[in-house]
């Protein structure tokens, strides 16, 4: 009889099955098969927080099939993902199938290649109880908070609300940033720039100080004009000249959080979209000439470690493609930030076969997976390349009683930048190359320009900067970052506005209540300490029962006190005004948040119960009737779609997004589907690739 190998997904099963052959049957559990019940707390607080797991309702048939296969099998191996969630799935599978968790029936694959699968199969182990207990403790903590706190929010704010332990901290960060922006008072200042010539070349230097070295930054136009007047007739000469060399190092290969951040900045992906594509790359895709294989190592990792074998393969490719001089002459190492031993057992995210280039892979895959693979491959390869070498120069220009400064650099060896440089969210102060200069050299003033500026408030978080903030505060984890953002948006606490995260009126009301009644729940340091405690459980250095109890005792006391504090009180969530008028009574309509997002409701409620769907004009025209505007709408399940405003007279609808670009053939609205734009007008058939951003 064949041995039974159980993984999470059919895609992973297909790839692994190809490597294992006919002596093994590889099947999928389709994710978790057991969980805490939805209809009750499911935790016996009085008896050491014992969880009361039940089989997930729609998994009954699957569990029956797994049990039947297990009875016929010549052995069972649990090959779920190598992290907390994967260990929990294996623990529950072992429990259901009657396996001894202390026996070596657990295997893991850091990469799903022939070599990676062979290595995993050669090293079976017992289920890691500490790793499972870390997952179990997190699940119990989150259930205690959600199940106990949500009814409080129903009574004091609005029915249907829910609260989460980590999500509440994320909303707090976003709301705090919004308060900073609202309280920010811009301050005026002026830049004074001199464009200076030497021969046929010129450069720009900025006012920095007076002749004594005192920094100067004019606060208003009068001060700027006074400086301009003081510079009339002044000679501009090269006073101080500093030349040097610097080496710019590449960034390390990705971990989960940096992958999500870079994909957001460079590709415009949400964290969820990034992880979906990464999951596909890890579990396996069909590659021409190679068959089905996993293209990257496991994508949920905190570790920056790279195996010696992968480094050697990268350097071999670099030497062949770019030359020996592009290889880093020493072994690059990056210290993994506060990783547990279990977390650091993984590698960073890298291509499983470094020599498999994006150009070769692009023949077999496209869209998100192709873009993400190219980014992962390029970043990893660059991390093993030589530094970028630069000659630097900074100059202080003397002009009467004032000093101007400029700096620049020249690349003498491009090194890793020939392949990859990290994207940034903020506009960096750009250095430019300066013309050859000598100390004492007289410069020609071509233009003196003063420009009014104002200090800027801090920017709202993007997905990338929020993930970075969570990571820097010790809250983010590979398995939680993407779900956190999705959850707070789905719950109506946060919304996206031009790719920035903005708290809704509901989110601000809930955050204010949480801060007032449960300050420790939304405290960043408290949450970071809890994550450290979970890491200690994973490392076998802390008991999960005590960790949960320490938290719950304080939380239960806070909840009891909050009930007393808020007795007879309710938090009023301000309604968001709109320009719409109620069709039933003519009163103004306001924007409210319901189960499936925002909708319009009459401000005269409860006397008038008029409602409307909240629609958004996309700027496009219906390709079917050519008359109605294309409006963004939401389905009954909250999914966004686009339809003609003349419905039901015109029934055109699509899930694909209208774009501003018009059809080159007929002038109709174009729609985006994946990496292409297409015209939906009957008989046209025009298609084009999505234009690349500069």
Kindly give the residue locations of the regions a language model identified:
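Metal- or metallocofactor-binding catalytic centers and their adjacent structured scaffolds
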Residues: 212-252
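A short, conserved structural fragment
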Residues: 282-297, 491-500
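Basic, low-complexity terminal or inter-domain segments flanking catalytic cores
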Residues: 2-3, 150, 183, 224, ...
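Structured, non-catalytic alpha/beta "coupling" segments that mediate domain-domain communication
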Residues: 14-37, 168-215, 383-432, 588
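C-terminal or mid-to-C-terminal helical accessory/interaction module adjacent to the motor/catalytic core
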Residues: 112-194, 243-244
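Intrinsically disordered, low-complexity regulatory segments
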Residues: 1-139, 148, 209, 218-225, ...
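Short acidic, hydrophobic short linear motifs in intrinsically disordered regions
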Residues: 238-241, 250-263, 290-299, 457-469
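Short, hydrophobic-biased segments on the C-terminal half of alpha helices
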Residues: 275-279, 485-486
């Amino acid at each position: 009889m064949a041995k039974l190998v159980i993984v999470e997904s059919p895609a992973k099963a297909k790839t692994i099955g190809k490597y294992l052959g006919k002596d093994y049957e590889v099947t999928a559990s389709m994710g978790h098969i057991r969980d805490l019940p939805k209809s009750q707390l499911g935790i016996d607080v009085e008896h050491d927080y014992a969880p009361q797991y039940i089989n997930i309702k729609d998994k009954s048939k699957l569990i029956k099939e797994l049990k039947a296969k297990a009875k016929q099998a010549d052995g069972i191996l649990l090959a779920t993902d190598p992290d907390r969630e994967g260990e929990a799935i294996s623990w529950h599978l072992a429990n259901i199938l009657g396996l001894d968790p202390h026996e070596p029936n657990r295997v893991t694959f850091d990469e799903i290649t022939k070599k990676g699968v062979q290595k995993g199969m050669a090293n079976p182990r017992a289920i890691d109880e500490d790793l499972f207990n870390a997952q179990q403790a997190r699940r119990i903590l989150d259930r205690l908070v959600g199940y106990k706190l949500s009814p409080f929010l129903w009574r004091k704010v609005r029915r249907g609300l829910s609260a989460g332990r980590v999500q509440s901290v994320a909303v707090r960060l976003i709301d705090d940033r919004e308060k900073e922006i609202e309280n920010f008072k811009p301050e005026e200042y002026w830049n004074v720039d001199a464009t200076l010539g030497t021969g046929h070349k010129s450069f720009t230097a900025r006012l920095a100080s007076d002749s004594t070295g005192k920094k100067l930054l004019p606060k208003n136009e009068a001060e700027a004009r006074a400086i301009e007047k003081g510079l009339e007739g002044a000679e501009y000469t090269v006073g101080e000249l500093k030349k040097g060399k610097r080496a710019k190092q590449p960034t390390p290969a990705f971990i989960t959080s940096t992958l999500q951040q870079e994909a957001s900045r460079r590709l415009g992906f949400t964290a969820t979209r990034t992880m979906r594509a990464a999951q596909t790359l890890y579990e396996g895709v069909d590659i021409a000439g190679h068959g089905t294989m996993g293209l990257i190592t496991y994508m949920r990792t905190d570790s920056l470690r790279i195996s010696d074998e992968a480094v050697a393969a990268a350097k071999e490719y670099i030497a062949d493609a770019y030359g020996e001089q592009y290889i880093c002459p020493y072994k690059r190492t990056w210290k993994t930030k506060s990783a547990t031993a279990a977390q650091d057992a993984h590698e960073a995210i890298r291509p499983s076969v470094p020599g498999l280039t994006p150009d070769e892979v692009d023949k077999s895959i496209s869209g998100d997976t192709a873009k993400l693979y190219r980014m992962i491959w390029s970043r990893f390869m660059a991390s093993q390349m030589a530094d970028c070498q630069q000659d630097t120069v900074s100059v202080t220009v003397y002009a009467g009683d004032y000093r101007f400064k400029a700096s620049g650099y020249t690349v003498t060896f491009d090194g890793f930048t020939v392949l990859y440089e990290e994207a940034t969210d903020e506009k960096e102060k750009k250095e430019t190359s300066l013309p050859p200069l000598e100390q004492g050299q007289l410069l020609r003033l071509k233009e003196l320009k003063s420009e009014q500026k104002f200090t800027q408030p801090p920017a709202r978080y993007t997905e990338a900067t929020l993930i970075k903030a969570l990571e820097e505060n010790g809250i983010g984890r590979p398995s939680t970052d993407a779900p956190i953002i999705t959850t707070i948006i789905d719950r109506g606490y946060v919304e996206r506005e031009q790719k920035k995260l903005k708290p809704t009126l509901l989110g601000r009301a809930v955050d204010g209540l949480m801060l007032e009644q449960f300050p420790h729940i939304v405290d960043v340091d408290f949450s970071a300490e809890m994550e450290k405690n979970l890491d200690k459980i994973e490392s076998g250095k802390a008991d999960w029962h005590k960790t949960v109890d320490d938290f719950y005792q304080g939380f239960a006391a806070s909840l009891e006190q909050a009930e007393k504090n808020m007795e007879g009180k309710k938090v009023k969530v301000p309604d968001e005004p709109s320009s719409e008028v109620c069709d039933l009574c003519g009163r103004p309509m306001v924007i409210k948040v319901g189960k499936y997002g925002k909708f319009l409701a009459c401000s005269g409620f409860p006397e008038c119960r008029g409602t409307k769907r909240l629609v958004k004009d996309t700027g496009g025209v219906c390709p079917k009737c050519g008359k109605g505007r294309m409006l963004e709408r939401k389905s009954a399940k909250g999914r966004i779609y686009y339809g003609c405003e003349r419905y039901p007279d015109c029934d055109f609808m699509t899930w694909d997004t209208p774009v501003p670009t018009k059809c080159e053939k007929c002038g109709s609205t174009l729609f985006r589907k994946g990496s292409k734009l297409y015209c939906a007008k009957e008989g046209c058939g025009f298609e084009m690739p999505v234009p690349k951003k500069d």
